[in-house]
Design a protein with these regions (language model features):
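Conserved RNA-binding domains used in RNP assembly and mRNA/RNA metabolism
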Residues: 1-75
Length: 75
């Protein structure tokens, strides 16, 4: 398998930060990341603006891959 795919699959089960193309940020536990479409399924997700002042909580959130600009692990 491609190394890029391995990196994405390695994020599954971990807390991640996802920055979206519209400037919003999502933090949550990555349940599944499809390496071909970049679609992401998150549990216990918080959606906020870039400053973090407004936040909304979701139990489960699906993010379309075409909206993702960055995925990073949270420590």
């Amino acid at each position: 398998m491609n190394k890029f795919f391995d990196v994405l699959k390695g994020l599954e089960g971990k807390n991640v930060l996802i920055k979206l193309r519209n400037g919003l940020e999502v933090r949550g536990k990555a349940v599944m990341i499809d390496p071909q479409t970049m679609n992401v399924l998150l549990n216990d997700a918080d959606l906020s603006n870039a400053g973090g002042s407004d936040s909304e909580h979701f139990g489960v959130l699906i993010i379309r891959g075409d909206q993702v600009s960055l995925i990073a692990p949270l420590s």
